[in-house]
């Protein structure tokens, strides 16, 4: 089952989430918004099994990456008012 993976702009480009993902759902892409010059991207969300290892690996105080499981609403994702 595919899950929604949202990557926020406070990503520091550390690659921890990419290395933690057992299914290679994530990859790094160029981005000028941080010192590392890259940020995580989730091009293969159809392979996401919702293990949330990427969330656990994220070192930022406010998670840069979130996995929203199938039953979670768009309101919990911050996509609705």
UniProtKB/Swiss-Prot annotation:
Its main location: plastid. It catalyses: reduced [plastocyanin] + hnu + oxidized [2Fe-2S]-[ferredoxin] = oxidized [plastocyanin] + reduced [2Fe-2S]-[ferredoxin]. [4Fe-4S] cluster 1 binds at residues 11, 14, 17, 58. GO terms for molecular function: 4 iron, 4 sulfur cluster binding; electron transfer activity; metal ion binding; oxidoreductase activity. It is found in: Plastid, Chloroplast thylakoid membrane. PROSITE patterns: 4FE4S_FER_1 (PS00198), 4FE4S_FER_2 (PS51379). HAMAP family: PSI_PsaC. The eukaryotic PSI reaction center is composed of at least 11 subunits. One of its GO terms (cellular component) is chloroplast thylakoid membrane. This is Photosystem I iron-sulfur center. Its EC number is 1.97.1.12. Apoprotein for the two 4Fe-4S centers FA and FB of photosystem I (PSI); essential for photochemical activity. FB is the terminal electron acceptor of PSI, donating electrons to ferredoxin. The C-terminus interacts with PsaA/B/D and helps assemble the protein into the PSI complex. Required for binding of PsaD and PsaE to PSI. PSI is a plastocyanin/cytochrome c6-ferredoxin oxidoreductase, converting photonic excitation into a charge separation, which transfers an electron from the donor P700 chlorophyll pair to the spectroscopically characterized acceptors A0, A1, FX, FA and FB in turn. The keyword Lipid biosynthesis does not apply. It is an enzyme of class 1 (oxidoreductase). [4Fe-4S] cluster 2 binds at residues 21, 48, 51, 54. One of its GO terms (biological process) is photosynthetic electron transport in photosystem I. InterPro entries: 4Fe4S_Fe-S-bd (IPR017896), 4Fe4S_Fe_S_CS (IPR017900), PSI_iron-sulfur_center (IPR050157), PSI_PsaC (IPR017491). Its cofactor is [4Fe-4S] cluster. It is a peripheral membrane protein.
């Amino acid at each position: 089952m595919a899950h929604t993976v949202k990557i926020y702009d406070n990503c520091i480009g550390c690659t921890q989430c990419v290395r933690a993902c057992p299914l290679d759902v994530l990859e790094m892409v160029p981005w000028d918004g941080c010192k590392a010059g890259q940020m995580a991207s989730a091009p293969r969300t159809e392979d996401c099994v919702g293990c949330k290892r990427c969330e656990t690996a994220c070192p930022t105080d406010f998670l840069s990456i979130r996995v929203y499981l199938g039953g979670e609403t768009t309101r919990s994702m911050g996509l609705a008012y």
